[in-house]
């Protein structure tokens, strides 16, 4: 007979715990949003090349290289901000967080300028053709998430400047960071589908 006391335990009490409610909530939100984006991306891919009238993506789209670099770079800066907060370095946290906000704002500004050019110069609206409908739906959906993220980033910065953000609130800041990484990751998919495959 095997002595149960001699068997190694897979884990000891206290070695693990359930994730916090915040983490469960943000992961659930991200999964839900990912499903929504998947549907819209699939619709965009399905309708590629099916517009009966112009303009076409090849005729009017310009690849947003600089704004894409800025948005993806914001994932690096927010990661550096998180690290600074864990080390209780408020100055560096605020600096990197502010840079993240500026990069996000630049991306939104570039998107707005692109839309202005498409509408005023090329007369591409959401009603022009299937390309216009799917383009504004997909890019607009992503832009709306960037706006939400930018509002959250700004709220955190204001709270930090008022002395309300410390290392004790790191998990809350991490949740904002997770959301922002998700927004950036989605843009990689949108960029690939719209500006690479779709052209």
Residue spans for each PLM region:
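...captures the hydrophobic TM-helix bundle architecture rather than a specific catalytic motif
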Residues: 1-199
């Amino acid at each position: 007979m095997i002595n149960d006391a001699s068997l190694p335990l897979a884990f000891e009490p206290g070695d693990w715990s359930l994730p916090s409610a915040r983490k469960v909530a943000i992961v659930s939100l991200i999964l839900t949003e990912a499903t929504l984006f998947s549907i819209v991306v699939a619709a965009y891919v399905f309708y590629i090349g099916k517009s009966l009238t112009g303009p076409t993506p090849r005729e009017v789209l310009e690849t947003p290289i600089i704004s894409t670099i800025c948005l993806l770079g914001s994932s690096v800066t927010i990661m550096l901000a998180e690290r600074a907060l864990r080390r209780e370095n408020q100055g560096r946290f605020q600096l990197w967080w502010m840079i993240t906000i500026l990069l996000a704002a630049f991306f939104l500004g570039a998107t707005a300028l692109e839309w202005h050019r498409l509408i005023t110069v090329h007369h591409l609206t959401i009603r022009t053709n299937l390309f216009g409908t799917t383009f504004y739906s997909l890019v607009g959906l992503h832009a709306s998430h960037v706006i939400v993220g930018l509002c959250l980033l700004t709220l955190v910065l204001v709270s930090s400047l008022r002395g309300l953000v410390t290392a004790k609130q790191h998990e809350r800041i991490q949740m904002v960071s997770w959301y922002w990484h998700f927004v950036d990751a989605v843009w990689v998919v949108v960029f690939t589908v719209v500006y690479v495959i779709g052209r």
